[in-house]
From Swiss-Prot:
Organism of origin: Mumps virus (strain SBL)
Record note on domains: The N-terminus consists of a long intrinsically disordered tail. The central part contains the coiled-coil multimerization domain (MD or OD). Forms a four-stranded coiled coil structure. The C-terminus constitutes the alpha-helical X domain (XD) that binds to the nucleocapsid (N-RNA complex) and the L polymerase.
Keywords: Coiled coil, Phosphoprotein, Viral RNA replication
Pfam families according to UniProt: Paramyx_P_V_C
Residue list for modification Phosphothreonine: T10, T16, T91, T150, T165, T250, T258, T282, T298, T375
Region (Multimerization), start-end ranges: 216-279
Region (Interaction with the nucleoprotein): 343-391
Stretches assigned to coiled coil: 218-245
Lineage, broadest ranks: Viruses, Riboviria, Orthornavirae, Negarnaviricota, Haploviricotina
Protein name, entry field: Phosphoprotein
Gene3D superfamilies in the cross-refs: 1.20.5.300, DNA helicase RuvA subunit, C-terminal domain (1.10.8.10)
Length: 391
C-alpha cells in the first residue's frame, strides 16, 4: 500500500471524522450498553477509548434501506461500497477506518462488525485517531480568558500594571487554538477566512537595568586593602619626587641670581671702556671724511633766471713790481696745536694695568712702556694692548 495519503483521501478522512464526532455528540449515552475494553476490536481501541458507544452497528451485509435510514437518523454518513466487495460479507476490509467511495453498490456505515478483525496498517489507524480528535476538539468550546491588550506607554507600565498577572490558557495536547473566537460555519473543517490576530501580551514586561555582578566575582576585603596600600605607596613616591624637584628649583634660582650679578658687572666694565676710549664710531679714516666734505659743483634747476655771481672781485691790484694782479690771498697761518695734558691719561692707564693685568711680567712690561710714552698715540696703543690682554 502506498504510504503517502492523497488529498482526496485526506478530505474523506476529515469528513468521516466529523461525522463520527457529530454522531457521538448527538447520540444519548446509555450506561448499560457501554462498550468495555474487552469488546473493542484489537487495533481500534486507541481510536474508540473515551468515546460514547455507537448504536446499531451496520454490517457489510446489511440492506441499503436500513443503512440509509439509520445513517440519516443518527447523523452518520453512509458510504457506497463497490459491488465487487459487497458480496464478500466475511472478507476483511484492507483499510477499515478509511471512507470508501465509489459509484454504485451497497450502502454501509464506516463502522465494522466487531467480529471481523481489521487488517489496516498502523499508520492509517493513527491518522484516523488524529483526525477524530481534532474534529472533536474543534467543536468543543472551552471557557477562555481573554488576554487584556495593554496600551504601550513610554517608560514601561506603572506599578499597578506590573502587579497584575496575565493568566494564559493552557493547551492540553491538541487543544483548540486561542486565536479564533468564533465557531467555524463549515462542517468540512476548511477555514473560510483568517481572523486578524490582535496584539497580545504573553508576559509582564520587565524593566531593563544593569545586572548585578555575581557573588563569585566579588573581591575580598583583604584584596581591597592591598590595592589601597599599593596606591598609597605610589602616591608617596610621587610626593617625594615633587619635593626633590622643589629643592632643585631653589638651586636654579640661586644660580640665576649669580648669573644676573655677573652680567651686571660685565655691563659696568663695558660702559667704563667706552667712556675711556670713544674712538671713531664709523672706523673711516679722517682723509676720506675731509674729501667727502670738499667743494663740489651744485646745479640748480627750475624756472627763473639765476643771476651770475662770482666770488672774486674784478678789481686789480699792483704788486711790488707794479704788475697788475688780482687781490692777493692772505697766507695761511698754521695754528699751533695745544699741548694736551697727558698726566691724567697716564693715571687712568696705570689704574687699568693694576685692575686688568694679572700676570706680573706683563704688568711690568706695560709700566715700562707707559713711562717711555710721551705722545697721545703711544698712550692709546698701550691702552688697546691692555684691553686685548684682559679679554
Amino acid at each position: 500500500m502506498d504510504q503517502f495519503i492523497k488529498q482526496d483521501e485526506t478530505g474523506d478522512l476529515i469528513e468521516t471524522g466529523m461525522n463520527v464526532a457529530n454522531h457521538f455528540l448527538s447520540a444519548p449515552i446509555q450506561g448499560t450498553n457501554s462498550l468495555s475494553k474487552a469488546s473493542i476490536i484489537p487495533g481500534v481501541a486507541p481510536v474508540l477509548i473515551g468515546n460514547p458507544e455507537q448504536k446499531n452497528i451496520q454490517h457489510p451485509t446489511a440492506s441499503h434501506q436500513g443503512s440509509k435510514s439509520k445513517g440519516s437518523g443518527s447523523g452518520v454518513r453512509s458510504i457506497i461500497v463497490p459491488p465487487s466487495e459487497a458480496g464478500n460479507g466475511g472478507t476483511q476490509d484492507p483499510e477499515p477506518l478509511f471512507a470508501q467511495t465509489g459509484q454504485g453498490g451497497i450502502v454501509t456505515t464506516v463502522y465494522q462488525d466487531p467480529t471481523i478483525q481489521p487488517t489496516g496498517s498502523s499508520r492509517s489507524v493513527e491518522l484516523a485517531k488524529i483526525g477524530k480528535e481534532r474534529m472533536i476538539n474543534r467543536f468543543v468550546e472551552k471557557p477562555r480568558i481573554s488576554t487584556p491588550v495593554t496600551e504601550f506607554k513610554r517608560g514601561g507600565p506603572g506599578a499597578a500594571a506590573q502587579g497584575q498577572t496575565i493568566q494564559e490558557e493552557g493547551i492540553d495536547g491538541n487543544g483548540a487554538s486561542a486565536g479564533s473566537k468564533e465557531r467555524s460555519g463549515s462542517l468540512s473543517g476548511a477555514t473560510l477566512y483568517a481572523h486578524l490576530s490582535l496584539p497580545q501580551q504573553d508576559s509582564t514586561p520587565a524593566n531593563v537595568g544593569i545586572a548585578p555582578q555575581s557573588a563569585i566575582s566579588a573581591n575580598e576585603i583583604m584584596d581591597l586593602l592591598r590595592g589601597m596600600d599599593a596606591r598609597l605607596q605610589h602616591l608617596e613616591q610621587k610626593v617625594d619626587k615633587v619635593l626633590a624637584q622643589g629643592s632643585m628649583v631653589t638651586q636654579i634660582k640661586n644660580e640665576l641670581s649669580t648669573v644676573k650679578t655677573t652680567l651686571a658687572t660685565i655691563e659696568g666694565m663695558m660702559a667704563t671702556v667706552k667712556i675711556m676710549d670713544p674712538g671713531n664710531p664709523t672706523g673711516v679714516p679722517v682723509d676720506e671724511l675731509r674729501r667727502s666734505f670738499s667743494d663740489h659743483v651744485t646745479i640748480v634747476s627750475g624756472p627763473g633766471d639765476v643771476p651770475f655771481s662770482s666770488s672774486e672781485e674784478p678789481t686789480l691790484y699792483l704788486d711790488e713790481l707794479a704788475r697788475p694782479v688780482s687781490k692777493p690771498r692772505p697766507a695761511k697761518q698754521t695754528k699751533p696745536q695745544p699741548v694736551k695734558d697727558l698726566a691724567g691719561r697716564k693715571v687712568m692707564i696705570t689704574k687699568m694695568i693694576t685692575d686688568c693685568v694679572a700676570n706680573p711680567q706683563m704688568k711690568q712690561a706695560f709700566e715700562q712702556r707707559l713711562a717711555k710714552a710721551s705722545t697721545e698715540d703711544a698712550l692709546n696703543d698701550i691702552k688697546r694692548d691692555i684691553i686685548r690682554s684682559a679679554i
